[in-house]
Amino acid sequence: MARGGAGRAVALGLVLRLLFGLRTGLEAAPAPAHTRVQVSGSRADSCPTDTFQCLTSGYCVPLSWRCDGDQDCSDGSDEEDCRIESCAQNGQCQPQSALPCSCDNISGCSDVSDKNLNCSRPPCQESELHCILDDVCIPHTWRCDGHPDCLDSSDELSCDTDTEIDKIFQEENATTTRISTTMENETSFRNVTFTSAGDSSRNPSAYGVIAAAGVLSAILVSATLLILLRLRGQGYLPPPGLLVAVKESLLLSERKTSLI
């Protein structure tokens, strides 16, 4: 009888040890990870609110797997429309934070909701230049300065064409200026010439010069005539034609002097 009691005690101890070991093993085992759960039936929105339902297969995946850069649905529907996705699967938008989230493509909100905002930059000012691809405004004075300031280098495009156009405009302006200056100079010269010719008869100094020239001409002709007469008296007769020409010149000079 004592042997039977000892056997039962040994068996009970073995059972307790087995139960204790099983309990320890269960506690040490890792917690099960999130797994895909296939929904029975194809009814839409049959997944829990904290999961996302794949469009084609109907699997329910954790909502945190949505737009994480890894396709968890076979059709990739969990990675579609991620740029403008700002609300949860159930249509409830994320709560607003105390400070507004910025549209700088850098996560500044605790829920990373500003990464999914469909933002647009305000237009550039009149003194600024809009870069084509990177959507940035830079000062207009930076255009064609030999250094690309836009990421796409659009501020340094078509600079040669603009330079040639500026040169053409400058050359045309210079030519127009030269023509205008030449015409003004010619007009001024003509006005001065006409004024001098028109006012000579009314200018006392010009009148005196003309009168002096007439007197000198008469004296010169008279001296020439006297020389010819002396030569004739000495027997050196000049040709008759020369004497007649001298007399006519003397008469012409006297007429001019009388007209003045």
Swiss-Prot record:
Entry-listed glycosylation sites: N118, N185
Keywords: Cell membrane, Disulfide bond, Glycoprotein, Growth factor, Membrane, Metal-binding, Repeat, Signal, Transmembrane, Transmembrane helix
Gene from which this protein is expressed: Cd320
Protein's UniProt name: CD320 antigen
GO MF entries: calcium ion binding; cargo receptor activity; cobalamin binding; growth factor activity
Record-linked PANTHER family: CD320 ANTIGEN, LOW-DENSITY LIPOPROTEIN RECEPTOR-RELATED
Disulfides per UniProt: C47-C60, C54-C73, C67-C82, C124-C137, C131-C150, C144-C159
Domain LDL-receptor class A: 46-83, 123-160
